[in-house]
Amino acid sequence: MKINHYQKGVGLIEVLVALLLLAVGVLGYSILQIRAVDASSEALSRSQGMLITRALAENMRANPGAQTNYPAAVRGFTNITAAPTVPSPTCYNSVCTPAQMANFDAYMAARSAFAIGMNITMADCPGVGSAPIKRQCIFVAWGNTTLSVSGTTADVSNCMNTSGVYVNGSNCLMMEAY
């Protein structure tokens, strides 16, 4: 019986190729898992931001006498770097004027946003620069996206351009309030 010796090691090469293919497959699956975790984190942040903006918008609708007070009240809490201080009166049990209630509602929204690493502001909605009654929008940003206020104007250019299109790569959302 004659044995062919030129076939030695071929089985080992096949095993190494199979292991290489398996490693590439596992690496691809790991990358998919990382992307899924990132997408879940982004979805959580968007949901939390929507809860904050919706709560503030509902408070604004419940306090129509102070609608003009809300933009300045919310912008007053935009550039905070520490937990905001409670305004006086607290408006939990005390009787407050509509303007005081607007300030307290803005504080509650800013406190909620700050607690989860977000920033909140209020500005004219995009595309209403010449409208007789300018709609107001609530903006919430997190991560590397910043919102700022200079004087009485909110700068949301890191979030959205003037025509209402989100900036590519920004972590923010906008809700029309009234």
Residue spans for each PLM region:
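Aliphatic-rich helix starts adjacent to a transmembrane/signal segment
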Residues: 2-54
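Flexible, low-complexity segments enriched in proline/glycine/serine and punctuated by aromatic residues
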Residues: 41-44, 51-178
